[in-house]
Every structure is written in structure tokens, then in C-alpha cells.
From Swiss-Prot:
Keywords: Heme, Iron, Metal-binding, Oxygen transport, Transport. The keyword Iron applies. Heme b binds at residues 64, 93. It comes from the Eukaryota. This is Hemoglobin subunit gamma. Belongs to the globin family. Pfam families: Globin (PF00042). Heterotetramer of two alpha chains and two gamma chains in fetal hemoglobin (Hb F). CDD domains: Hb-beta-like.
Length: 147
């Protein structure tokens, strides 16, 4: 599993305290659905996903994005046990939803882009490296139940 230094934990936690979960979550998930349109098949009950503007304005996309980032917030509180934190979600996404685990990496990368957009100069190379490590660790934890 991923090991975070005290400095990485501090950097991640500090920035996380400033994140608007609803806004950033909706934008990250929306970007995933726009940039990687094949991921839309997992969200067929979300209604209109016919264009970038429809996706980015879709209330179900925003709500699910918020839900995703709320789970990420739980992970940030438990950085030393990402696998345990995401055990249930890993099982759900593997056994019931059959989500390609590669999509977790893609969403993590979109989140890093969104954070960089929102935090600008505050999103230094050090901050980016810590967040890349965080989203990679989450992707590994979510993929854990896959065979």
C-alpha cells in the first residue's frame, strides 16, 4: 500500500480543508465523462449526457461527484488505511457495478487537474506530487477487490 510522509499528509490535509467538495467533485466527474466518454455507460440513469454542457450542468453528475469527494474526505482522514477505507466501495464497484478499475486512475487525474485550476499558484509541484500519490493510492485501494 501507499505510505505517506508526515509532510505529504500535512500538504494533502491543508489543501483539502479549502476544497469545495460539491463544486470540485461535480467538475472532476463531469470532466471524466466528457474527456473519456466511454465512462458514461456506468451512468446511464443520469439522464442527458449528450454534450459537454449537458454533462457539466447535470445535477446527478454534480451530486455523484460530491459523493465521490465525500468518500475521498474519509480517505484523507484515514490515509494509513486506504485499503480498509475503500474495501466496501471496491467490492461494490467490482462485483456489482463492474467498473473498469482503470477508470479510478482517470478520475483521480481529473481531480488533480481541477484542484490545480482552483488553487493556482498554491498548487505547487510539491502539492501536486502529494495529491498524485493520494489519488494513485485511492485507485489502488478501489481496485483491490478485482481479481
Amino acid at each position: 500500500m501507499v505510505h505517506f510522509t508526515a509532510e505529504e499528509k500535512a500538504v494533502i490535509t491543508s489543501l483539502w480543508g479549502k476544497v469545495n467538495v460539491e463544486e470540485a467533485g461535480g467538475e472532476a466527474l463531469g470532466r471524466l465523462l466528457v474527456v473519456y466518454p466511454w465512462t458514461q455507460r456506468f451512468f446511464d440513469n443520469f439522464g442527458n449526457l449528450s454534450s459537454a454542457s449537458a454533462i457539466m450542468g447535470n445535477p446527478k453528475v454534480k451530486a455523484h461527484g460530491k459523493k465521490v469527494l465525500t468518500s475521498l474526505g474519509d480517505a484523507i482522514k484515514n490515509m494509513d488505511d486506504l485499503k480498509g477505507t475503500f474495501a466496501h466501495l471496491s467490492e461494490l464497484h467490482c462485483d456489482r457495478l463492474h467498473v473498469d478499475p482503470e477508470n479510478f486512475k482517470l478520475l483521480g487525474n481529473e481531480l488533480v487537474i481541477v484542484l490545480a485550476k482552483y488553487f493556482g499558484k498554491e498548487f505547487t509541484p510539491q502539492v501536486q506530487a502529494a495529491w498524485q500519490k493520494m489519488v494513485a493510492g485511492v485507485a489502488i485501494a478501489l481496485a483491490h477487490k478485482y481479481h
